[in-house]
Each structure stands twice: as structure tokens, then as C-alpha cells.
Amino acid sequence: MKDLLKFLKQQSKTEEFNGIKIGLASPDLIRSWSFGEVKKPETINYRTFKPEREGLFCARIFGPVKDYECLCGKYKRLKHRGVICEKCGVEVTQTKVRRERMGHIDLASPVAHIWFLKSLPSRIGLMLDMTLRDIERVLYFESFVVIEPGMTSLERGQMLTEENYLDALEEYGDEFEAKMGAEAVLELLRAIELEKEIEMMREELPSINSETRRKKITKRLKLVEAFFQSGNKPEWMILKVLPVLPPDLRPLVPLDGGRFATSDLNDLYRRVINRNNRLKRLLDLAAPDIIVRNEKRMLQESVDALLDNGRRGRAITGSNKRPLKSLADMIKGKQGRFRQNLLGKRVDYSGRSVITVGPTLRLHQCGLPKKMALELFKPFIYGKLEGRGLATTIKAAKKMVEREVPEVWDVLDDVIREHPVMLNRAPTLHRLGIQAFEPVLIEGKAIQLHPLVCAAYNADFDGDQMAVHVPLTLEAQLEARSLMMSTNNILSPANGEPVITPSQDVVLGLYYTSRECVNGKGEGMVFESVDEVEKAYRTKFAAIHARVKVRITETNIDENGERSESRRIVDTTVGRALLSRILPKGLSYDLVNQNMGKKQISKLLNTCYRQLGLKDTVIFADQLMYAGFHYATVSGASVGINDMVIPDEKYTLVADAEAEVLEIQEQFQSGLVTAGERYNKVIDIWASANEKVSKAMMENLSSETVINREGVPEKQESFNSIYMMADSGARGSAAQIRQLAGMRGLMAKPDGSIIETPIVANFREGLNVSQYFISTHGARKGLADTALKTANSGYLTRRLVDVAQDLVVIEDDCGTFEGLTMKPLIEGGDVVEPLRERVLGRVVAIDVMYPGTEKVLAPRNTLLDEAWCDLLEEHSVDEMIVRSVISCDTDFGVCKACYGRDLARGHIINQGEAIGVVAAQSIGEPGTQLTMRTFHIGGAASRASAENNVQVKNAGTVKLHNAKHVTNSEGKLVIVSRSSEIAIIDELGREKERYKVPYGTILEKLEEASVAAGEIIANWDPHTHPIISEVAGSIKFVDMLDGVTMTRQTDELTGLSSIVVMEVGQRPTAGKEMRPAIRLVGADGNDLMIPGTEVPAQYFLPANAIVNQDDNAPINVGDALARIPQESSKTRDITGGLPRVADLFEARKPKEPAILAEYSGTISFGKETKGKRRLVITPADGSEAYEEMIPKWRNLNVFEGEKVERGEVIADGAEAAHDILRLRGIHKVANYIVNEVQDVYRLQGVKINDKHIEVIIRQMLRKCEITNAGDSQFLAGEQAEVSRVKIANRELEAQGKQPATFERELLGITKASLATESFISAASFQETTRVLTEAAVGGKSDKLRGLKENVIVGRLIPAGTGYSYHQKRNAAAAAGTTTEAAPAISASEAEQNLADLLNLAGSSD
């Protein structure tokens, strides 16, 4: 018995390891793995089904087919363990060795490994410094290569064709040696002396001038160094021995009907073996060279196909015309080893079923069908039945459960009590997609789900299915209860707001209850307590909406948790008084004394959580839900066609709009406006008509006039069901009501352009055929979009998770003084995000002072909670520096202080929290809600009429930001720069509003002027882009020839003529090279200069520009020389929604990026070329000037002689993130990406905390480029991990040596994932072949730092509850001891268990 135990213990002993190293295998190593050579291509004997000897399934090489039984049957049973049968040569052992024992094939001729040959850049090619084509010609026997030139004029590695070779033979005889095939490459590789090569290249590098050559040598140097340091030998890239996979990993399975299903690998191996054997025979026979050569080539091709089928030439196909799955295909892709089996596995003890509503459940419960529970908890039930003596053996218990005897149900109740189960709904987009509940047994076959958790699961009850999983061990149950219980996940990790807020019916019920109505039954009564109100309501003395006075009792909790009661009389309604009964003690009555819409309810829950904590909130949420359902039922809110009230004004408004459109049409026909302008104006007219109709409709819907108690008519909010649903936030929106009762309005075509005839009808009136047809456009596009969106969103989430998966909180405080500067976000006249929302839950990096004093308001390292934020707001702080993960100094992780508050828990984050994954999920999860396209409301085009002025909302003073302006003849300012902004500053100097104003805007106020609220301070024409004159003079036309570069159009009505510049494509040949322009000359006929510069005032005219001035006409400063009609609403395709987010995270360069100044200095223009101008920046310190060529069609924002700062915009366009990082630094680029991503989400009304985006940006910035290596091991121009460089620099500084300098680099998320230190993580993400090839050549070792690597090797992850395990391991490793993975039970216990098992096995037979 003891031996058996020892033996079992030996089997279960695990090896401890701290990393995984990958390298090239030498032929000897492959032979040492092998248990024998596979010599025959046969698999199994088709009659006996026994494996053939020396074949691909040979039992002698790979082990026995049956447990503890040799092939011929001479030795059976455990007692012969380890014996090798003398008859058939099979070792008696377990069958599972067939999963681990490898064989080998001795190749008759060496073969190149295709990965190192074809995976770019070709490693063999780089090593030999030959091109891939040349090497392939040698390998596939098309030409010779010189190996040993001897005393001849040939060079080593020179290619020779067949003829050249024969000529050389005649000339030199056997002085030299040249070969073809893999042997030749093998000898070349073997001859390389790595150390010498490294020395040579290192000496050569500094003296090289050509950039390309230097790049090439650096690349080769890196490769050679990698080989040298890893101990790999170059010749191992050529295979002499081929390993054979264990047979159970490429199984051969008999199907019924005597046929076999086999893995494709067996076919590929058989090909290799056949060709190899044939080649051996040919070599023995000394066959003619050409035949041997052909056979060697075929062998090379068959090994290629085995390793990576389809990498070179056509893929080898099987009998079903499908390419065979090679070894490389087994590990890559979604169905490959990594993603199918290692990162996600199927689990036992799970079931799935349809879900239905469980409105009677508590928040921590779910309804589990009895049938499912019985199946899921079977082992527990067996155990209990035996323990209670109801069943003698497991078999008896099994029979009882199958018969479903009554005792079984009692036992099931006991087993289930307080045993949480996990519910999961696919797709699991964030961590709230799996939550734990306590099961409640129910009849029926559907799982019941609590309505409040639907939002987190994104579940509805139209046939959704959910899966149930049972945590088995005590630890698993504990984790499920403490971490995953639905009651512990009240706040969303994405934004820290309650995620269990009521929706739909519940909201409608609560809203209905809390509404007030004029002259309701019982209005004006006074009650002494809430109980009395309830009495009056139940006895029908008071209607639920009646306004009454009630004395209420409130519980106040002060800072120390002391409770005190206070009473007061409030004006309220019956319904609100009833709601206050479920309000937890300690909350103010004012929270329910209002119309309870969705927002108010969410705020109420949030306040409850912050003031009273988790338990009260959970109970309260349930109570709210029950109340909501109850009152929604009682209210009888329903929808009838009469509820959609069409306003009477609609018809006059529509008629007015039609008249306006006709007028525009006439103007167009008489040539006053261009087609584009007409289109734009028409669309504007209809957009504003639509707005007016919907406004009239909402006013009509939202209020009604009733007679009050005094008999006087009084206006009150309407009780129209549709209006109540939209107003409360239960269902529907103003836009949808507009389509029901207003007019459907403008529709978009699938390409996003707007159809100019709107749908005047609404759904109540009904659509005619043409209107219906126009509608289908947008609707169909919407459906197609949704399908695409889901896939794209999932892929974005996957990339995000992959880049951020190894980011974990690993220390308390890194002590950095850096951080991000936070200001309120202002767009137009609104504060989009006040400062408090941006800094809530962050840590202060540098003391915040009372504004205007030296007194500290919030000291460094304060965690800003709600109270602190109130304080900051009180003292109107509008700028401060907070800690951020981007500037955190921790290596391989972040610290608690830089992250701040854990949004889902409401206190500072814990160590071991996997913030990377949480961030990725928070950004990815709402991805499915983001639109793919810029417009869409059921296909209706949402486009406000174009803005043409700035109207101020607050009084204050005007301030201009990077605006250049000239003063026109009327004394008004005209803006002549492009990215200008106007800000309004209040008396405290805080910015209240900020507006972007286009080129050509006319300002009504000067800078520093004070304005009143509602004043219009700027005007411009939204449909044309003017060209403004900056000097006064007279016009000279340049290259303006009628019929060559421009056409004249005369208006019949007015007789005015205008000039239109022709497009290049439409000009005759003579005009192709001409560049039409307007030059300004003075009275003396000489060129005028642009003010303050040496540049002549000459304005180039783009195609389609309209000039209303004549040659030699006088012109004033600030007048328009020409106007360029702006194209229709689709001007610049603004990438909206999801693609925009993906572009930002991938750090893609925009098509026409803005050009930024590379240095600070003075601008001048050098010699022009045909299509470009030369921009020169001369730095102020007199160092070398910087030159850049800029295409002429780019609009420049700068003039000659102007001073620019580094990073300022020179030519407009979308800014590229890389440029911002290079020229303005890390904080600016972080701000840019955060704001741009937030813009997209804000548009959809999704709230995400900035922290999450910053976490991803930190990962995008984790690489840097070495600019100067100093005394370090790095090479200049090498890409390295920032944390590595920092660690190396610390060591160098400690020794007094010179540290390396580096520049941060911004990588897109895909690139950053592939550039991670861990090759396992990168290989399981994308481009598996390339990653593994690179890692093997460099002999990389994976330290298993991230989450993915640990999941793949089957360990606890170094985050969450597995964090402490890894901490202990790391501590032990640092101390130099290896921790032995101890078995969980002692030997004596194991012995007892085993004895019991054996008894059982014996007795139940």
C-alpha cells in the first residue's frame, strides 16, 4: 500500500519553474528527446488495429496502447510496471506516455527550417547577408553557391548557375568547392564565427554614413548578438533530424463503418518519411545527380509543408481539396492551441437555459430550475445522502437521484443553502458579465434573473440564454461570495456610478408616484405622519398626486456616526410621502420630494451608497424596485394613437419652409447661388423647420391647462403617457416622439449624405410610398452597421485587453512629483466636464493653494473624495496637478497613489488589482453602443442648422486664443488665422466659455471688451470660405485667362459678373501648369508686402473659387478677395464612433496630418519647387536652420518673419499623436488622446473615467528609442522597454557611469501588444509564427509577469487573490530558496482516502 502511495505521489509532483525559455534545438537535443527512430510511413495494421512496428504509431517507440499492458499481451497488470517485453519490445506503463514521448526521423539530407527562411525578415538570409531569393535558389536546387573559394577569383557565398559552375570547374578544377541545397547553406552557416562577426560590425558601424546601410548592419548585428548570447548556433536553423510529435497529439480514430479519421499531421509525416526513405535508397544506389537532386528538393518541400503548409508555394491539399493543417496552423489563430485550449477551456458543472424575469427575487438571488440544480449539484447530493445514511453506496445514491425520491429534494435544499452559483451571459464584455447569486429553487425550466442586474448583463427577456457555473471548492465559493456577489457589485468599474439603477417599468412607476397634479382629490390636507397619509390614500380620501402638507421624521447622521432625529412639515404629494417609507434612515426627505426620473433615482442610489454604505443601498434598491413595479401597474399608463398629439402649428411651419425653399430654388436658377450653396441652404431650412415643429409638439405634449381649486385655469405638466415615458427616462426620447407626432424630417442616404426632400409626414399620419422608400435607406444601413459594429467592437476590446493585461497595482507609492494638469473641459458655451468630475477619486501631486494666496488648501498625496471636491469647488480652484498612471514611476506595474480610487469600490485601490484588464473592459464594453457612422437616429439625419455666429451665455470679458486678425474699414476685427478660439472670462479670471471660430469671422467686440449675456460677438458665413485681404491696395490678376483657367458667369437679372476658377482637370493644356492668383499692388504699381514680413501679398486661388472683384479694382483691409463655396454637409468625413476610437488607440497617422513646427524660431521661405514650398525655421540661438518641404495646396497658418514655438501648428489638418509626443511632450499627447476618445463616448452619452484611457496610454508609451547609449549595453536607435532602460540607468548612475538617454515612443495597441517582453503573450495575440521565430532565435526567456502567460502555463494569475501567492514566490526566489509545491493533504489522509476508495470499488461491483 505504501509503495502505491509513493508511486502516486511521485506522479502528482509538480516541477517549479520561474520562466519559460525558447530556443533552437540542436540535432543532438532532438535525438535526446526521442525514444526511437520512425522508419516506416505505416500507421496501424488495418486488420488487428495494432500499431505497426517502427511506424508512426509504433508502441515500442511511443509506449503501450493500453494501460500497463504490452502489445503482444505477455505482461499485464500493475505488478509488471516498468518491465520491457522481450517479445514485442514495449515498456509496460501508462498509456498517457503516448502523449509525451517523441520520436525522430534521421534525414538523409539536411533541410532548411521554413520559419527561419521565409518568416520576414529571413533569419538565414540576414545571417549569411544574402538575399532571400538567392538562398531559395540554392535550397531548391536551381543554382550553386561557393563554399570554399580556395585560391580562385571566386568569392565565398557567390551564386553560380549550372553553366557558370561547369565553366569554373573547367577553369579551376577542384581548387574550389561549390554545392547546392541545404548542405551548402549548412556549411556556410557553420563557418560563421559569431564573435569575430560582432567585433567586425561594431568596428564598422561608426564609420558608416549611408542611413540604409547602417540600418541593415544594426539589424544584422542584433541578430548575430542574439545568437551569440543565447548560445544558439546558426547551423541549427537547418534541420538534420526531424522530431516526431507524440502519437496521441495527432490521433487516428476509428469511425463506425471501418473507416478512420486521422489528423492531417499524419499525412504530412508520411510524405516526409516516404521521400526520406526513397532518398536514402537513391543515395545507396549512387543514382544520377539529377534524380537525387529532385528527391532532395521534394524532401525539402515536404518538410516545409509539415512545419508550415502554404508558407511557400501552393499548400499541399488532402483528399477533400482542403489544405492540410500543419504544425504552425495547430498553434495559431482562434482555433489554434493558444486561444482554443490554453486561454479558454470548457468547464464542468455548468448548464445553460433561457432567462425570465424574477421580480420577486432579492438582489442576491436567482431562480434556478430544480432539474438543473439536481444535475449541477449531483456529487454534493450523493455525499449528503450517504452522510445521512439514506444511501449505503454511491451507486445507491445515484439510483435514488435518478428516481427522484422525495428525500432527494430535502437534501438538495440543504446542499444549495448558501452555496452561490455564477451566472454568465455571453458576450461577457466586462467583469459584470459574470456575477454570483444564491440559487432559489423554482419549478419550470427557465432561470429567473433579478431585473436590476439586467443592465450589467445587458440582458433582456426576448429569448436570451445564460450559463450557470458552480464553484466547487470552499475557496472558490468564498471568492464568489465576497468578490462576485451581485450585491457587492453595485458600482460600475467604468465610471463609479451605480450600475444597478432601475430602468423602464420601475422608473415609470416611481415617476408616476412622485408627480404632482393640480386640484387632485384631497389637495391641501395636512397630515401628522406618513402613516396617516397612507391611511388616507388607501381609503381613497386622497389621490396619489394630490399636493398635501406632511410632518415627517428624518434621521440625521453626523461625522461620528451619531444618529439624531428631527421633525418638520413639508409641502409634498401623497405619492412622495408613500415613497419616503422605503427611504433608508439617514437620507434626507428632499431626495424623494421631486419628480423621480431615471437620473434622480440614480443620484438617489449613489447618495445612499456614499452616505450609508453597501448593505442599506442593496435593501433600498430592492424596495425601490418592488415599489416601482407596484405603482407602474396601478398607474395604468398605456399608449394609444390619440396620445401622439400633432401640433396645429405644424402645417403652417411646413408651408413656410416650402416657400423658403422655392425662393432659394429661384435664386439658384438665376445664378445667384451655386448648387452646393443651394443644397446646404435647403437642408438648413428643413433642419430648422423640423426643430420648430418638434419644439411646438413637445410644448403641446408636455403641458395641459386645468382648473385649480380657486376655479382659475393653471398650467401643469401633462399626464400624457408617451410624454411621461420619455420625460422619466423609462423609454423613448424626444427624437422618437418627434417621428411619431411631429415630422420624420431629413433622411440620410447610406453614404451619409442627406436627401434634400424631407419626410413631412409622421408615423401617426402615415407615410406614402415615396416617403416609405426614402426611409428604408437609412434603416437598412442601420441594421447592416449593427452587425459590423459588434464584430469590430469585440476586436477592439481584444486588442485593448492584450496591451494592458499585465498592468497590476504592485506598490503603495512610487513617490513621483509628476502628474497631469487638470482643468475643467469647456466646449462652446458649456462646461462639458467640471473640474470636480475630472479629479474626483484622484491623488493630489503638488499642494493645491487657496487661489491667490500661499496657503495650502489640499496637501500633496490627498485622495480627493466628494467632500474634498466640494471644498475645491467652494474656493473656485480651476487648475491643479493630480497623480496619473502615465507618470507613475513603478517598474512593471503602477502604484496605488498614481491610480487613486477603485471606482467599483469607492475607496483607494488595493494592491493586486488588475487595472489593465478593467480599463480595457471599461473602454471596450460600450463599444457596441458607439455608432459606426456619424449620423443615425433610425436613419434620420441629425444635423443642426449650420452655426454662423457666437452668442455668449455668460457675461464676462473677451479673450482671443492664437488668433491673428486685421481691422477692416468699419473698425471691426476680421480673423485671418485658422485654429482660433474666443474665450469668455468671468471676474475671477475663470474661463466660462470657449468657441472655435473659422477664418474670415468678423468680431463685433475687441479683445478685453466686456460683454453681456446673450450678446452676439462674432459672425461668419457657414457656407463659403472667404479669402481675406490683409493690406489695402488694388488687385492684379495673375494667370487668370478667360476660358483657360477661369470662366465668367453673368447674372441675367442683375447684370453682375463673377469669375469662377476652373478645376485643373477641366482646363485646356495651356492652363494645366498655371496657378491663378490675386496680387495686391500699391498706387505706384509695386507689390505690396504682407504686414511685418518680406513676403509679397499674393493669394493663390483654389479650384471653384468665385471672384467678385475685377482686375485693378481697389480693395480695403479685411475685405473678401474671393470666396470658396464649402461643399455639402459631408465636407470633411469626420470619422465618428468606433473607428475613431480604434484610430486613436492604434496611433494611426491621419491622411493629411497637421504640420507642426519642429523647432522654435523665425519662419522664412526658401526656394520653391514645382509642387512644394520650402519652409525654413531659423532658431533664435543661431544654431543650424531647419528646412521642410510643404506641398503648395496646404493652407499655411504662418507668414514670413513670424516667430513660432516648437509644436505650433504650421499647416492645418488633423494632428498626429506621434508629432504631439515628439514636439510637445508626454502630458500633451495624453491629454489629446484622452479628450479625443472621450469626445466620441460623450456624444453617445457614455461615461468613462479618464483613468482607464490613461492606463491604455501608459501601455502605448512603454517603449522608447535610445538616442545615446552612454555606458549601457543598448545600441543607439534601438527600441527598448522604458522600465528596462530606467533600471539600467539607475545601476549605471550608482556606479558613476554615464546613463543612456532615450526618447519615448508611442506605439499603437496592436504593435505594443506584439512588442511586449513576454513572447507567450505576444504569440497568443497575433502573428504567432513571427513572434515565435524571433523569440527562438534570440533564445528569449519569458519571466511570466503578465496575466496571460500565467493562465497559459496553468498558474494562478499575479493579480487579485493570486497576487499574494506570487508575492510569496517572488520573495522566496529573492531569498534563493525554491518553494516546493506541497500536496494539499498529508500522506496519512491520502492513505485513508485511498483505502476507502479501494473498498468502495470492491464492494460495488
Curated annotation (Swiss-Prot):
Q: Which GO terms describe its molecular function?
A: DNA binding; DNA-directed RNA polymerase activity; magnesium ion binding; zinc ion binding
Kindly give the Pfam families that the UniProt entry links to this protein.
RNA_pol_Rpb1_1, RNA_pol_Rpb1_2, RNA_pol_Rpb1_3, RNA_pol_Rpb1_4, RNA_pol_Rpb1_5
The UniProt entry's GO biological process terms, in alphabetical order, are: DNA-templated transcription
User: Which residues of this UniProt protein bind Mg(2+)?
Assistant: D460, D462, D464
Q: Name one GO cellular component term.
A: DNA-directed RNA polymerase complex
Report the coiled-coil segments.
none
Annotated Zn(2+) 1 binding lies at: C70, C72, C85, C88
EC nos: 2.7.7.6
Query: Which reaction is catalysed here?
Result: RNA(n) + a ribonucleoside 5'-triphosphate = RNA(n+1) + diphosphate
Residues the record lists as binding Zn(2+) 2: C814, C888, C895, C898
Q: What does this protein do?
A: DNA-dependent RNA polymerase catalyzes the transcription of DNA into RNA using the four ribonucleoside triphosphates as substrates.
Which HAMAP family would you find in this protein's record?
RNApol_bact_RpoC
How does the annotation summarize its subunit structure? The RNAP catalytic core consists of 2 alpha, 1 beta, 1 beta' and 1 omega subunit. When a sigma factor is associated with the core the holoenzyme is formed, which can initiate transcription.
Name the family the entry cites. Belongs to the RNA polymerase beta' chain family.
Name it. Answer: DNA-directed RNA polymerase subunit beta'
Q: Which organism is it from?
A: Shewanella sediminis (strain HAW-EB3)
